[in-house]
Design a protein with these regions (language model features):
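Short, functionally critical alpha-helical segments immediately adjacent to catalytic or ligand/cofactor-binding
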Residues: 10-26, 58-61, 115-116
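Long, hydrophobic/aromatic-enriched structural stretches that serve as scaffold segments
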Residues: 1-13
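Solvent-exposed, acidic/flexible segments
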Residues: 7-8, 27-31, 44, 48-55, ...
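Acidic, glycine-anchored loop motifs typical of Ca2+
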Residues: 96-105
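C-terminal soluble interaction/assembly domains
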Residues: 137-233
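Secretory-pathway/luminal and periplasmic proteins that interact with or process carbohydrate-rich
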Residues: 23-32, 44-48, 64-70, 83-84, ...
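Substrate-binding/active-site groove segments that recognize
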Residues: 33-42, 80-95, 115
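Acidic, aromatic-lined catalytic clefts of primarily extracellular/periplasmic carbohydrate-active enzymes
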Residues: 47-91
């Protein structure tokens, strides 16, 4: 994992965090035959085009011997391996790091390298901020607050949010010219035990994790666990 970190410039703590959250460090990668899963889901009218495309990509990967069809067991939705890659993600980002002529995402060498390559390709910046918890001066969701992961809106310079944040001075170590957004995973801000109104100020790296999984809570969890692992290592 250290070799992968150096080659792709992605923190090992982030890789460990993602693998822990996705598959409990490879202990549960799913038991579904993803070829059968994608074949079935391609007939689901709600997302037929998406799953049909994933199925065709998977068949092409098998046909060209890039992956071994005997190992293709994963989630009901067709995700596979320690980091739960869909076939399109395998096609675009997976790496045969140990050079054995197969991409095996249940092999740590290929899995770590593939995840690191994906993160590098979507723009993760090593040693850059992800998010910080803040307290707002009001508990009604204002127009600048993001509660949906579909697209973060109302991004501004950090300094432009100063009047809304109680503990703004605690952020004085951050460049106030950075573009940021404010999010809460809940539709309403719920005051905490101290009657404060918690939310999160998020940076560019946070949005990169949203490209991996379009969930505000998922991205918060990944960045939180990454920092915890870094503290413990």
């Amino acid at each position: 994992i250290n070799e992968v970190e150096n080659k792709y410039n992605i923190e090992k703590e982030l890789l460990l965090s993602l693998m822990g959250i996705e598959t409990n460090y490879g202990t549960y990668v799913g038991k579904m035959d993803i070829l059968s899963s994608l074949s079935t889901l391609s007939f689901d009218k709600r997302r037929s085009q998406f799953f049909t495309n994933e199925l065709l990509i998977l068949l092409r990967l098998i046909e060209t011997n890039q992956i071994d069809y005997k190992t293709l067991y994963g989630s009901w939705a067709g995700a596979f391996g320690f980091f739960q890659f869909m076939p399109s993600t395998i096609k675009n980002h997976a790496i045969d790091f140990d050079q054995d002529d197969y991409i095996d995402l249940k092999n740590p060498n290929d899995a770590y390298a593939s995840a690191a390559n994906y993160l590098n390709n979507i723009g993760w910046k090593k040693k850059s901020h992800c998010f910080y918890k803040i307290n707002l001066k009001e508990n009604n969701p204002p127009e600048y607050l993001n509660t949906s992961a579909k697209k973060l809106v109302n991004k501004r310079k950090l300094r432009d949010f100063k009047k809304f944040i109680i503990d703004y001075n605690n952020l004085n170590f951050i460049d106030d010219n950075l573009d940021v957004a404010i999010i809460t995973p809940d539709k309403d801000i719920i005051p905490d035990a101290n009657n404060l109104n918690p939310a999160y100020i998020v940076f560019d790296n946070y949005e990169k994790i949203l490209k991996w999984n379009r969930s505000l809570r998922f991205a918060l969890a990944v960045c939180t666990l990454k920092d915890r692992i870094k503290h413990e290592l």
